């Protein structure tokens, strides 16, 4: 279960049980001319959307987490996320391996043994990043998730609107989109 929480709160907190939902209406593109070095550093998970029943069931208990993106030895990214779980801060690291074009990665869930694609759809590097993850836990169990990352704990209203519009364009509904509340724990440098 810790793996589930880590993946959800970190980037693509992937590998949770999925409910089928309408397929995305548009193909997801990757940030043109993605500059991985500018993407490094601290981010806060500000919003999530997913077709997984887990998000709908647990969204009231979720809160913002801090993630630090660092280069990995293989050219990919290490995503280290610190989040609140059972009133304690937990830290997990996941390896995003490069997958084709710049800004495209893959992540293999050690818990489920499934591989997910993770794309940096849009970022200005200084304020926000929109990420989209997709994969399959098994036959007929498609998983999709969008994540809004912010360099600050208080993303601007326009960024939330941009994220909501992006999510709806991917077929997510209002009940599958959540903006994560700040917490006074686990968000500062440790």
Curated annotation (Swiss-Prot):
It is an enzyme of class 5 (isomerase). One of its GO terms (molecular function) is retinoid binding. One of its GO terms (cellular component) is extracellular region. Transmembrane segments: none annotated. It holds the Pfam family Lipocalin. Residues 1-22 form the signal peptide. This is Prostaglandin-H2 D-isomerase. The gene is PTGDS.
């Amino acid at each position: 279960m810790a793996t589930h929480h880590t993946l959800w709160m970190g980037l693509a907190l992937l590998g949770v049980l999925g409910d089928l939902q309408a397929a995305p209406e548009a193909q997801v593109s990757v940030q043109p001319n993605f500059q991985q070095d500018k993407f490094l550093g601290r981010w806060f998970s500000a919003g999530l959307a997913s077709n997984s029943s887990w998000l709908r069931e647990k969204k009231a208990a979720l809160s913002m987490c801090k993630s630090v993106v660092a280069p990995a030895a293989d050219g990919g990214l290490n995503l280290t996320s610190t989040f609140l779980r059972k009133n304690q801060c937990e830290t997990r690291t996941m390896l995003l391996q490069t997958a084709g074009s710049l800004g495209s990665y893959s992540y293999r869930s050690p818990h489920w043994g499934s591989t997910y694609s993770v794309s940096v759809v849009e970022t200005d590097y200084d304020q926000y990043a929109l990420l989209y993850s997709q994969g399959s836990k098994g036959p007929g169990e498609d998983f999709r998730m969008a994540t809004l990352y912010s360099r600050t704990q208080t993303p601007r209203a326009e960024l939330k609107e941009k994220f909501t519009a992006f999510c709806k364009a991917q077929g997510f509904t209002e009940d599958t989109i959540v903006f994560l509340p700040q917490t006074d724990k686990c968000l500062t440098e440790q």
